[in-house]
Amino acid sequence: MAFKDTFNKMISYFDTDEVNEVEEDVAASTDNVIPRSQQSVRASSHPKQEPRNNHVQQDHQARSQEQTRSQMHPKHGTSERYYQQSQPKEGHEMVDRRKRMSTSSIANRRERYQQSTCSDQTTIALKYPHKYEDAQEIVDLLIVNECVLIDFQFMLDAQARRCLDFIDGASKVLYGSLQKVGSSMYLLAPSNVSVNIEEMTIPHTTQDIGFDFDMKRR
């Protein structure tokens, strides 16, 4: 009996070892199963967070695009206000420019008219020679294309004839003309001036038939 009891104890001992090994195997398998489930849960939780991040990024991009569009293209109301504010300024500037152009054109026309009239005008100088040397001054006026009305009333007959001969010769050299217009007055004209004098009866004195001098004594 004692031997049998010892044999049964030995059998029961080995049976408990097998049970412990089985329990250890089951525990290890459960340990391996739990991390896998946790990994699957974690893996499933990450994809849920990624769409949220994508939505946030899309919102930021949309806002940034709207801001750039608003900066690039101003609102219609602001553009109309700017146009309305700039339009009166442009109108005033155009009016000022037109006024300046009109005044400048008028000034240019006046200058041109004055230049043309000055170039077309002919002056007539009235001279009262007192001596023979004054004849040279009269000829100088003829050289610059001026008409000279000569009155010999302050010269003696002999001096007047000498002065008249000198002026007549100079007028022929310069292609001018010398015409008698009064008893003691002669008109000396350049070549570009034509003189038309009507025939009139000039009273003659006993002094000379060709030269009717009515001279005064100095």
UniProtKB/Swiss-Prot annotation:
Pfam families: SepF (PF04472)
InterPro entries: Cell_div_SepF (IPR023052), Cell_div_SepF/SepF-rel (IPR007561), SepF-like_sf (IPR038594)
Residue spans of biased composition, Polar residues class: 29-43
GO BP term, example: division septum assembly
Keywords, ordered alphabetically: Cell cycle, Cell division, Cytoplasm, Septation
Primary location group: cytoplasm
Organism superkingdom: Bacteria
Regions of compositional bias (Basic and acidic residues) in chain numbering: 47-63
Localisation: Cytoplasm
GO cellular component: cytoplasm
Stretches for region Disordered: 25-115
Family label: Belongs to the SepF family.
Assembly: Homodimer. Interacts with FtsZ.
Function of the molecule: Cell division protein that is part of the divisome complex and is recruited early to the Z-ring. Probably stimulates Z-ring formation, perhaps through the cross-linking of FtsZ protofilaments. Its function overlaps with FtsA.
The name this protein goes by in its record: Cell division protein SepF
Organism: Streptococcus pyogenes serotype M2 (strain MGAS10270)
Gene: sepF
